Structures are given as structure tokens and as C-alpha cells.
């Protein structure tokens, strides 16, 4: 692994970010900014939910599962927003609001990476169901963001995509 082989350098960081097919980011500022400035696609496995990077049409993302400590159930999309954790970025904030973050499964991550690879190579076949789910997801996302009554909107035009397979397998989550 590049980061642990002892050959890491600032030049190689920039070179790899500029030349990669895509970058896998686990959230927060950091390396993914390098591929971003070179217009390379990013796969985001992201929290906080309200701060999904939506401005690059080549980006794909999923979010960690939000589990209620009280009911032990996975929260729906709108429940994440109504639980005051959509913009939280520290584990302490989630704990204070009674929410546990559950990492995405290896299958969920693999599905997202495969989708990105298929999109880049022109092999991805978007279905009518996928288009409908993307529209429903982003519409619900924008509605919930408006309810936060922020002084200034966090997102302009939404260009990114949420993981299609994740949406297909979690349709009840989008409400």
C-alpha cells in the first residue's frame, strides 16, 4: 500500500491524484481534494449526511447507516435529519443524539466501486428505476436540507449520484 511503503512523497500524492481513474474517499478533507481539483471522479463513503459533496457530476456516494440506540433500527432518510445529526461530524455529537454509525458492509462498498468503474468505462446501464430512485433521493434530500433553515444553502445544483444499488436495496430508507 502506497501510504505505508515508505516511498510516499508530496509529488507522488499529486501525481496519483491527478492520474487515478477515481479515488475512494471515506469522508472529511484530505487526499480526495487532489483528484477533485484534477476533475477525477470520487467515490464517497460519507458522513456527515447533510454535507454530501454534490457538485461533481462524476462523483458517487453512499452514507454510513445511522442506527437508533433506543430502537436499534436503521433510521430512514428523514429520521436522520429530524434526529439533529444530518450535519454532525463527531462521534460525540452522534452519541449525544442517541445515534450509532454503522460502517457500510464490504458488499455495499464493492457495489459502489463496481458502479463507478462501470460508469467510467461506459458499461453502466442506468434503468428507469435507477433514474426514478435518484430523483426521489435528491428531491427528499433537498426538502430535508431546506427544513434545516440554514442562513445560506450548502449546495448549488446537485450533479453527483448516490449509489444506485444501495438505493435499489434500501428503497424504504428514502422517506
Locate the predicted segments by residue.
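Leloir-type glycosyltransferase catalytic cores
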Residues: 57-175
Amino acid at each position: 500500500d502506497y501510504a505505508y511503503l515508505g516511498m510516499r512523497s508530496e509529488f507522488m500524492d499529486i501525481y496519483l491524484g491527478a492520474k487515478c481513474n477515481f479515488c475512494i474517499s471515506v469522508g472529511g478533507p484530505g487526499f480526495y481534494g487532489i483528484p477533485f481539483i484534477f476533475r477525477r471522479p470520487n467515490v464517497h463513503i460519507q458522513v456527515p449526511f447533510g454535507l454530501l459533496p454534490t457538485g461533481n457530476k462524476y462523483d458517487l456516494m453512499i452514507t454510513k447507516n445511522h442506527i437508533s440506540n433506543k430502537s436499534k433500527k436503521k433510521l430512514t432518510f428523514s429520521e436522520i435529519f429530524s434526529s439533529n445529526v444530518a450535519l454532525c461530524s463527531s462521534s460525540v455529537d452522534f452519541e449525544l443524539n442517541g445515534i450509532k454509525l454503522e460502517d457500510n458492509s464490504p458488499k455495499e462498498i464493492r457495489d459502489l466501486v463496481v458502479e463507478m468503474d462501470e460508469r467510467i468505462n461506459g458499461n453502466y446501464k442506468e434503468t428507469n428505476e435507477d433514474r426514478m430512485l435518484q430523483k426521489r433521493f435528491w428531491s427528499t434530500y433537498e426538502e430535508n436540507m431546506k427544513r434545516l433553515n440554514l442562513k445560506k444553502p450548502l449546495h448549488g445544483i446537485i450533479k453527483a449520484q448516490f449509489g444506485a444499488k444501495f438505493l435499489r436495496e434500501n428503497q424504504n430508507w428514502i422517506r
